[in-house]
């Protein structure tokens, strides 16, 4: 329909355009001669005849007449070309001059198609065109009418020529009867016009008919498409049926193979039967040879007779047996058709059993025969010759038995071959199973993974066994080390608390980091998961610890029982030695376990990755398992359906099975009867053999009697013997007769049974027929069940393979289970023992915990006592000072000191002992230093990123060594003090005398001292107890030192490994040198403080030493009074020394602790700072993202505006183009009109000249001239009318031209406005693009800065995590020592209180500074508010500026020159500056001042912009500083416990920064206020420039001064900013250092977490593997049950499969039905071909009708039209007749081609194009038909194809001829078209000549009355349209006929494809 509408629209357009072109041509009949094209060549007949006519008519004409004819022809050419040009322009084709118009050119057909718009017309079938419309008839009618018109025009032309001749002949010049001629011409013209209009109406009707025909054709095409869809559905159904037929064919072939194999087995059985019968015959022949005597000849004859009868009976029985066997074979064949291979195999097995039974019976019969032979031997012993013969016969008989055995062996070999066949079938089944085993590969992989996991479990079990052995060995060690375990538990608790704190910190950091990046969130989630796993692992570790404790308690109980059992001390000593060895071994194992754990930790990452891979594989396996379960569910549903069907089948089969059982019982009876008959036949054969032997004996005896009568006696004896034998044989014969009678009876019974069985067989055959029908019905469902059976069989094979694999796995698992059970029993026993031991250990542990709690309480009390002692010591020091002064006075007079000097010597000895003790302690300190070095090495090895920290630690170690040196120096000082004491003792001896004098005074004071000493004694007792406890602790420490020494060896090996790691980490240490420098500075400060503290401590120790010495002196003096005080004095001295040492150690530990606390606090503060920095960065990121989003929104808005503006511009351009095209068309029309007017004027001039020449001739008489004058006047009037019409048309065109010009002006105005708007929009776009580029640049810079900051932050974070990790490792190692000495740290509370006071003071200062910061923040807020106000003011200023701009716009509109200048400057400067410039240009006198003000304005604007940018930069710096202030605040809040120096520096920096910020903000405020005032003043001055000239100059001067001041201030602000940036860089470096520390710490935390995760994952793997073992056991049981079920299901499915083969027969019936359906389809196709033939008959009739019509037209033309005009168009009519003849021939050829034989190829000719899918499906169908129909189908099909190929070749030839003739017909139509155009041009030229002639008559003839005559006006008729329509219809018919050629090529392709099948 779309094509129709397009064609209809084209025709309507043609109508309108042709009408307009004709109007224009009527107004302007002439056209320029430059557009002239060559004339077309007319056909042969027409050109020749015209030439002849020209020769005959030109005999009496002059040369002048020929010139006039040439002029007329030129005018015709002009008119033809004008019409063609107009038609070309109206149809839209501008290249009409390029197209040739010759009728014989090959491109004219395409030209007509393009010109007429025929390519858009719909493709129609020739059938529909010829049946539904008589187009050819109508075309011929139209052509005949056109020919009549041409004829009439020819007559007119001849009349005109004759009139011209008469005018030219001077001899026969007469006056023309003008009135008659004019009336004649007018009548003719009116007739022609009426005829022409009638023909136009007829052409219009024909076009309408064409449209209806095309609509009908469209409907038919739609119906045809529906038919195609139906055909495709039929094809799909056929394909499905053929696929089912394929499957049935395959099953039939399989059944045929089975039948062949069964026939082979039957043939082998028959061969065995024949062999047995041949053996029976040989036995009969041997029996016939046994005849001996003549007397027995009668008997023998009787026996022979009997044997013959028996043989006849046997033959009859053989026949019966053969009949039975045939019936049985038929029955077996029925069974073979009904039963499957399994039933046949069962039959074969039954036959084998029967044959085995028959062989057994034959053996029994052979045994009986042997017994009979033995009897014969016994009877014939007398006759030795007979015995030899009998022995030979026996040997031959044995050989025969051997041959029978050989035949049996052969039969067995046949059976073995059949077994091989069965094996081959089974091998095929196994191959199918192997093909399906690939699907079970995944299960095998799972099993391998399970085995791998089982191996791992075994390894873990071995490890557990080793650990349990270690636990058993370490049971005694646990007793000794319970205290150590308690301490370690405490350490673990501390570590757990620290870990919890670190977790809290990490959680806080994670919560802050989650807001930054999603990736970090994911990592933190992973960390949280790891932490949860750690918690789970810790819980599991706690459970394991509890279990271990329980085991240790059990072990302790066991050890106690063992100790109770052990009686002797020798055994105890041996056990101790063994325990020591076990301890050493256990320590070694522990070291190894530690190494293994480390290796496990190192390998954990790889295990983690493998675990992830396993998880992925597990997920994949789960997905596969789900798919398998889905498949199993589907199969289960299918099995349920099959079971339902099976139930139905079983119901039917139950009846069949009953009948089969009855038949089988009958067959068994028949087989038994056959066996008995066979036995009897064998007996008869044996008897016949015996008879034959006897006959041979008789024959021999007779011969012997003939030759020897002498031996008659002996022969008689022999005869007697033979008679006895004969009697025995008769008895046997009687027995045989009885047996034969019995056999006959049995045979009668069997015959009756056979009759019954035959009846049963008939009944069964009827049942079998019903069953076959049922089976045919069942075979319909077989197709659906085959797929299910295949899937079930595949599943069965898979499950069977799985069953086999699982059985093997079950066996292995059962073996492993047995092993595991034994191991588990052993382990359970061990576990029971361990549980008992652990319970005992737990009890002990509880007791020890209670003891530890008590000891803690005692420690608390001791700490309190120590505090009291210190206070008392201080008091004692003050008292001792007083006492020393008193003793100095009393020493001179004290006599008793002589005795005490000896005691001093003893004291010296004790001091020497103490010196030795100090040496030992020094050695212990060295050992401790070595341990510390080892620990430091371990720390170096563990902390991979703290290489420089090792150097710091080494420096600390050197400091410790220096401290040891200082201690050694203190020892030397003690020695010097001892020397001094000796010197003092000498002095004391000198002062004794002085002391004696003061003894009385001392005694008074002694009482007070005794009281104080008593107090001291009490304190010393308490201290002694404490010292005892400390000694126990020291012993424990020594034991621990021994353990540590053993561990140092392990650590040394680890240290070597760690050195390698440190060598790798040295590369990363270069990045951390900056961090370590900062740390070294802090460490140096701390070391300086430590040195100060050490100096103070040395002073204190010296004081303590002095006090100790003085106390020793006092105690010596008191011991002189009381000897008991000496011991206490010694204890005090020792205690003081211990206190010194322990105070030193405590000081060292406190220093280390303080350092670690400081470092931890620094790390925490750094973490908080980093968190705050991250939050700040996140805020910045969010702000920047918001700004970027806003900018993107702005950009999107701008882009939308750009798109909108571009659309508007496009619309404007389109309008402009359309208007320009209209303008060009109008200009062309104008030019055409002018050219036509020029042509008219030229033709008029020529015509006037010719008339004047006629008038001036002398040969013309006066009346002729008068007549000519009258005619001239008459024609002039008509010509004036024509000129009036042309003038009117010209005026109309001029009006149109003016309108177009007006439109053009409007468009020009629009274009100017749009150009102006476009320039403005372009300027705005450029601005927006610049802004967009600036935004993009800023965005890129910000993104780069953000990326750099994020990278720096991540790097810092990584470094901080590494530092934290290293610090945590050091912390974990130092916390052990801190935990040991935590009870003693309370002594330093006084110092801590002092520090707290200092810290409180610092806190107060910090709070004050915070208040200052808050004030500064308030100032910043106020500054921001002022900035916002400033921005508001700026916005108000901008509004004022906008108002000024509006004012200036008004002024600019007044002066166009100023507007041009403004528009020229508008691209480079702002609108404000341009408007100011235009305002300045107004002022002539103030141009200079105004230019200066403009320059100042620009400078101020630039400065304002710079100030705004600076303000923005300052705002950004303020915001950054605010963020940094907040960050520093948080840092300072976290760093309350840091050093004073850092706090002071930071506070000073903050104060400086705040001051600078305040100064900057104040400066910015001042600048903003000043600039705002300046802007306001400047704007006011600009507004009043015309009125206030003098004020402008003064204000400009002031503004210059202020600008200079502002520039200076801005420079100062920039300098301050540079200083701030340097300070900020320093702060950033500090932050980077802290972030690096934090990164190192975070890396250490990650390693710890990874280790914990590894432990957790290992434990989870152990649990998972244990669960997998249990699940495997469950799976084994389930698989076994499943295998049993599957075996049952397999047996059932086999039974089902046996029943389903019966459906094949039904499918064969279906195949027959399909064959019949295909034949029916074939017939339907043939009928369709016949219908097409009938349609061709209708076509023939239509052609005949058209021929008749043509004949009638010819007759009418001959009757109506004279010969002269017929000759012009007769050639065209002949060509058309020839083409119609060709059409008839083509239709005959098509009719012949439609008479096709039956075949499948005609079905595919309906499609218009070759579809490969259709051909492929057709090939498949042909192949299926070949498979179904056999080899004959191919032959028939090839014959059909050959016929088709031959016929289609003939068709091709006819089509080729037809196509050539169609082209010729198209050319002839083109020639007709050209001739018609020429005729139209001729008619127009004739009308013009007639009008000119009329004007001449009016002018020249006085009698002529123009009013009485009808004025001639050129009729405006649509002649060209009707002609085009006729041509269009012709070409449409040609197109339809060409479709036949296309279909012919398509048919050829189809036939070629079919021939390739």
Swiss-Prot record:
GO terms for cellular component: cytoplasm; meiotic spindle pole body; mitotic spindle pole body. Residues 90-102 have a biased composition (Polar residues). The keyword Coiled coil applies. Residues 199-785, 804-1235, 1320-1471, 1481-1723 form a coiled coil. It comes from the Eukaryota. GO terms for biological process: ascospore-type prospore-specific spindle pole body remodeling. Residues 58-83 have a biased composition (Basic and acidic residues). It is found in: Cytoplasm, Cytoskeleton, Microtubule organizing center, Spindle pole body. Residues 1-102 are annotated as: Disordered. Has a role in the initiation of spore membrane formation. Belongs to the MPC70 family. Monomer. This is Sporulation-specific protein 15. The gene is spo15.
């Amino acid at each position: 329909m779309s094509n129709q509408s397009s064609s209809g629209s084209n025709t309507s357009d043609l109508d309108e355009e042709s009408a307009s072109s004709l109007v224009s041509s009527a107004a302007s009949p002439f056209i320029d001669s430059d557009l002239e094209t060559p004339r077309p060549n007319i056909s042969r007949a027409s050109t020749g005849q015209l030439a002849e006519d020209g020769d005959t008519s030109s005999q009496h004409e002059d040369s002048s007449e020929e010139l006039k004819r040439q002029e007329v022809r030129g005018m015709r050419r002009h008119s033809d070309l004008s019409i063609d040009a107009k038609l070309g322009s109206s149809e839209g084709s501008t290249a009409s001059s390029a197209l040739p118009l010759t009728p014989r050119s090959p491109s004219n057909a395409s030209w007509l198609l393009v010109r007429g718009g025929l390519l858009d017309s719909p493709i129609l079938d020739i059938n529909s065109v010829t049946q539904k419309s008589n187009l050819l008839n109508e075309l011929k009618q139209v052509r005949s009418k056109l020919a009549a018109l041409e004829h009439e025009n020819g007559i007119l032309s001849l009349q005109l020529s004759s009139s011209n001749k008469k005018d030219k002949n001077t001899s026969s010049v007469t006056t023309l009867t003008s009135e008659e001629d004019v009336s004649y011409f007018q009548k003719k013209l009116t007739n022609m016009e009426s005829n022409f209009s009638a023909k136009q109406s007829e052409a219009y009707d024909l076009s309408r008919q064409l449209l209806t025909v095309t609509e009908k054709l469209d409907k038919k095409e739609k119906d045809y498409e529906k038919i195609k869809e139906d055909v495709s559905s039929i094809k799909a159904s056929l394909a499905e049926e053929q696929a089912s037929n394929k499957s049935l064919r395959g099953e039939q072939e399989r059944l045929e193979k089975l039948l062949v194999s069964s026939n082979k087995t039957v043939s082998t059985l028959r061969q065995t039967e024949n062999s047995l019968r041949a053996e029976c015959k040989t036995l009969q022949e041997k029996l016939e040879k046994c005849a001996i005597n003549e007397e027995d000849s009668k008997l023998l004859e009787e026996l022979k007779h009997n044997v013959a009868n028996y043989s006849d009976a046997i033959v009859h029985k053989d026949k019966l047996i053969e009949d039975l066997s045939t019936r049985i074979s038929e029955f077996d064949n029925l069974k073979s058709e009904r039963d499957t291979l399994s039933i046949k195999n069962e039959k074969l097995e039954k036959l084998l059993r029967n044959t085995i039974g028959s062989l057994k019976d034959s053996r029994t019969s052979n045994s009986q025969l042997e017994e009979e032979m033995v009897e014969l031997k016994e009877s014939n012993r007398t006759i030795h010759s007979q015995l030899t013969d009998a022995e030979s016969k026996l040997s031959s008989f044995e050989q025969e038995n051997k041959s029978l055995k050989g035949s049996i062996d052969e039969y067995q070999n046949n059976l073995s071959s059949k077994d091989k066949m069965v094996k081959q079938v089974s091998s095929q089944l196994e191959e199918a199973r192997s093909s399906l085993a690939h699907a079970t590969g995944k299960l095998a992989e799972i099993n391998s993974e399970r085995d791998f996991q089982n191996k791992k479990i075994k390894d873990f079990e071995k490890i557990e066994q080793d650990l349990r052995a270690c636990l058993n060995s370490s049971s005694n060690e646990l007793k000794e080390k319970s205290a150590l375990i308690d301490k370690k538990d405490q350490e673990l608790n501390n570590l757990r608390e620290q870990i919890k704190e670190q977790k809290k910190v990490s959680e806080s950091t994670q919560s802050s980091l989650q807001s930054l990046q999603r990736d970090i969130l994911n990592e933190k989630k992973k960390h949280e998961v790891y932490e949860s796993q750690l918690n789970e692992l810790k819980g599991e570790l706690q459970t394991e610890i509890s279990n271990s404790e329980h085991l240790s308690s059990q072990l302790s109980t066991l050890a106690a029982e063992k100790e109770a059992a052990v009686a002797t001390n020798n055994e105890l000593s041996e056990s101790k030695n063994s325990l020591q060895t076990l301890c050493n071994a256990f320590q070694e194992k522990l070291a190894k376990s530690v190494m293994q754990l480390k290796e496990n930790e190192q390998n954990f990452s790889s295990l983690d990755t493998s675990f992830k891979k396993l998880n992925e594989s597990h997920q994949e396996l789960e997905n596969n398992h789900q798919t398998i379960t889905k498949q199993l569910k589907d199969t289960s549903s299918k099995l349920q359906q099959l079971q339902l069907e099976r139930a139905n089948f079983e119901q039917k089969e139950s009846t069949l099975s009953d009948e089969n059982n009855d038949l089988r019982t009958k067959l068994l009876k028949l087989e038994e009867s056959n066996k008995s008959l066979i036995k009897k036949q064998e007996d008869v054969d044996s008897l016949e053999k015996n008879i034959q032997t006897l006959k041979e004996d008789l024959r021999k005896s007779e011969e012997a009697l003939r030759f020897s009568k002498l031996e008659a006696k002996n022969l008689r004896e022999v005869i007697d013997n033979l008679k006895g034998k004969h009697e025995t044989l008769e008895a046997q014969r009687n027995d045989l007769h009885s047996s034969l009678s019995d056999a006959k009876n049995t045979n009668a019974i069997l015959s009756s049974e056979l009759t019954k069985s035959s009846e049963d067989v008939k009944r069964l055959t009827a049942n079998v027929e019903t069953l076959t029908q049922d089976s045919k019905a069942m075979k319909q469902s077989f197709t659906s069940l085959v797929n299910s059976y295949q899937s079930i069989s595949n599943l069965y094979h898979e499950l069977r393979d799985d069953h086999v694999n699982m059985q093997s796995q079950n066996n292995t698992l059962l073996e492993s289970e047995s092993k595991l059970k034994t191991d588990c029993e052993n382990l359970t026993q061990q576990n029971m023992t361990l549980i008992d031991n652990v319970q005992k250990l737990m009890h002990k542990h509880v007791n020890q915990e209670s003891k530890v709690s008590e000891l803690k309480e005692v420690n608390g009390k001791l700490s309190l006592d120590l505090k009291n002692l210190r206070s008392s010591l201080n008091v004692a020091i003050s008292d001792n000072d007083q006492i020393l002064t008193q003793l100095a006075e009393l020493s001179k007079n004290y006599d008793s000191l002589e005795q005490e000097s000896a005691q001093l010597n003893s004291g010296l000895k004790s001091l020497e002992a103490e010196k030795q003790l100090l040496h030992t302690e020094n050695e212990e300190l060295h050992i401790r230093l070595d341990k510390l070095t080892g620990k430091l090495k371990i720390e170096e090895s563990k902390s991979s990123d703290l290489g420089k920290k090792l150097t710091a630690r080494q420096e600390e170690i050197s400091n410790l060594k220096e401290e040891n040196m200082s201690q050694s120096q203190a020892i030397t000082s003690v020695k010097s003090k001892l020397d001094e004491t000796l010197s003092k003792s000498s002095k004391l001896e000198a002062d004794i005398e002085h002391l004696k004098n003061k003894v009385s005074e001392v005694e008074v004071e002694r009482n007070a001292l005794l009281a104080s000493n008593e107090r001291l004694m009490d304190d010393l007792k308490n201290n002694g107890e404490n010292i005892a406890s400390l000694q126990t602790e020291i012993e424990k420490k020594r034991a621990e030192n021994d353990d540590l020494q053993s561990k140092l060896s392990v650590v040394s090996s680890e240290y070597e490994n760690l050195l390698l790691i440190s060598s790798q980490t040295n590369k990363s240490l270069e990045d951390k040198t900056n961090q370590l420098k900062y740390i070294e500075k802090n460490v140096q400060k701390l070391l300086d403080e430590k040195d100060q503290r050490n100096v103070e401590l040395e002073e204190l120790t010296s004081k303590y030493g002095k006090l100790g010495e003085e106390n020793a002196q006092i105690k010596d003096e008191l011991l002189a009074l009381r000897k008991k005080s000496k011991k206490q004095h010694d204890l005090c001295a020792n205690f003081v020394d211990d206190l010194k040492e322990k105070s030193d150690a405590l000081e060292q530990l406190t220093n280390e602790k303080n350092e670690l606390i400081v470092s931890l606090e620094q790390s925490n503060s750094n973490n908080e700072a980093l968190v705050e920095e991250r939050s700040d960065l996140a805020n910045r990121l969010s702000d920047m993202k918001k700004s970027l989003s806003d900018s993107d929104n702005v950009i999107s808005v701008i882009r939308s505006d750009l798109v909108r503006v571009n659309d508007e511009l496009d619309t404007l351009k389109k309008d402009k183009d359309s208007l320009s095209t209209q303008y060009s068309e109008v200009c062309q029309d104008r030019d055409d009109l002018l050219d036509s007017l020029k042509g008219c004027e030229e033709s008029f001039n020529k015509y006037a000249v010719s008339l004047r020449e006629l008038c001036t001739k002398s040969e013309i008489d006066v009346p002729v001239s008068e007549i000519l004058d009258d005619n001239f006047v008459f024609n002039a009037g008509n010509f004036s009318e024509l000129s009036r019409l042309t003038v009117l048309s010209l005026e109309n065109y001029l009006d149109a031209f003016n309108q177009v010009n007006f439109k053009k002006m409007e468009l020009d105005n629009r274009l100017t406005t749009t150009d102006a708007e476009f320039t403005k929009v372009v300027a705005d776009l450029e601005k927006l693009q610049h802004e967009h580029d600036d935004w993009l640049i800023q965005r890129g810079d910000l993104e780069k800065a953000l990326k750099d900051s994020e990278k720096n932050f991540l790097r810092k974070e990584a470094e901080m995590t590494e530092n934290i990790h290293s610090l945590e490792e050091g912390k974990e190692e130092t916390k052990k020592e801190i935990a040991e000495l935590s009870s003693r740290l309370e002594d330093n509370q006084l110092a801590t209180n002092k520090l707290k006071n200092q810290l409180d003071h610092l806190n107060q200062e910090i709070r004050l500074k915070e208040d200052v910061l808050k004030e500064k923040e308030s100032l910043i807020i106020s500054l921001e508010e002022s900035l916002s106000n400033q921005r508001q003011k700026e916005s108000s200023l901008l509004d004022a500026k906008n108002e000024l701009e509006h004012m200036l716009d008004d002024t600019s509109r007044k002066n166009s020159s100023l507007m041009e200048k403004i528009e020229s400057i508008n691209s480079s400067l702002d609108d404000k500056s341009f408007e100011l410039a235009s305002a300045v240009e107004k002022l002539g006198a103030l141009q200079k001042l105004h230019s200066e003000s403009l320059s100042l304005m620009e400078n101020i604007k630039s400065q304002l912009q710079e100030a705004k940018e600076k303000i923005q930069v300052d705002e950004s710096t303020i915001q950054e500083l605010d963020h940094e202030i907040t960050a520093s605040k948080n840092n300072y809040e976290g760093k309350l416990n840091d050093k004073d120096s850092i706090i002071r520096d930071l506070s000073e920096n903050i104060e400086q920064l705040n001051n600078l910020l305040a100064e900057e903000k104040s400066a910015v405020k001042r600048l903003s206020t000043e600039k705002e005032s300046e802007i306001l003043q400047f704007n006011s001055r600009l507004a009043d420039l015309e009125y206030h000239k003098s004020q402008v100059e003064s204000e400009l001067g002031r503004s210059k001064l202020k600008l200079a001041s502002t520039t200076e201030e801005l420079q100062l602000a920039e300098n301050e900013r540079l200083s701030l940036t340097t300070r900020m860089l320093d702060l950033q470096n500090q932050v980077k250092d802290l972030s690096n520390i934090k990164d190192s710490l975070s890396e250490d935390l990650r390693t710890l977490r990874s280790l914990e995760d590894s432990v957790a994952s290992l434990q989870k793997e152990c649990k998972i593997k244990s669960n997998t073992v249990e699940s495997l056991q469950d799976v084994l049981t389930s698989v076994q049950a499943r295998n049993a079920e599957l075996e049952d299901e397999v047996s059932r499915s086999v039974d089902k499969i046996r029943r389903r083969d019966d459906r094949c027969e039904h499918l064969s019936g279906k195949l027959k039905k399909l064959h019949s359906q295909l034949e029916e389809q074939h017939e339907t196709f043939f009928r369709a071909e016949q219908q097409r033939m009938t349609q061709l008959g209708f076509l023939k009739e239509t052609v005949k009708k058209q021929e008749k019509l043509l004949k009638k037209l010819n007759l009418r033309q001959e009757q109506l039209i004279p010969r002269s005009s017929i000759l012009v168009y007769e050639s065209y009519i002949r060509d058309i007749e020839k083409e119609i003849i060709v059409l008839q021939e083509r239709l005959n050829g098509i009719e012949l081609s439609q008479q096709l034989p039956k075949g499948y190829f005609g079905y595919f000719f309906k499609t218009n194009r070759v579809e490969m899918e259709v051909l492929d499906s057709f090939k498949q169908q042909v192949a299926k038909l070949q498979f179904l129909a056999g080899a004959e189908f191919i032959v028939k099909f090839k014959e059909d194809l050959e016929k088709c190929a031959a016929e289609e070749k003939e068709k091709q030839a006819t089509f080729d001829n037809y196509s050539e003739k169609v082209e010729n017909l198209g050319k002839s139509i083109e020639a007709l078209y050209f001739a018609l155009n020429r005729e139209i041009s001729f008619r127009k030229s004739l009308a013009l000549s007639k009008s000119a002639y009329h004007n001449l008559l009016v002018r020249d003839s006085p009698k002529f009355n123009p009013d009485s005559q009808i004025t001639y006006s050129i009729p405006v008729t649509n002649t060209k349209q009707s002609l085009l329509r006729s041509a269009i219809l012709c070409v449409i018919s040609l197109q339809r006929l060409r479709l036949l050629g296309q279909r012919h090529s398509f048919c050829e392709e189809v036939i070629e494809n079919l021939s390739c099948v």
